[in-house]
């Protein structure tokens, strides 16, 4: 339920920004942060958090935007690292989940770059590093299956 509420607030903020009502957009975002705090409902790609961060970037509040994007990127990195720590059997049945979280992290980095966030310098190399680890492992597993 709170996932959809955060998403609705992000949509409201984006519409207010399009209408030039930046003060109202900022107030809506701040209200959503107060009423749906991340410690109760963690930021997630699917619950409007990315759109909220992007709205904060558009409003010039890069500190709040970066805080949200960092939490989102850290979550993706944590999942990706966890998948890579699995044994070969579990890893091979989790490749779609890995690919999903990798795509999420990649998209988050693109948003960071779009708004010239210094976070991109931290997470862009992670995207490449994690993908390379995945590709090496996936290739090794494919070779093992052919034998």
Per-region residue spans from a language model:
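C-terminal luminal/periplasmic domains and tails of membrane-associated envelope-modifying transferases
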Residues: 1-147
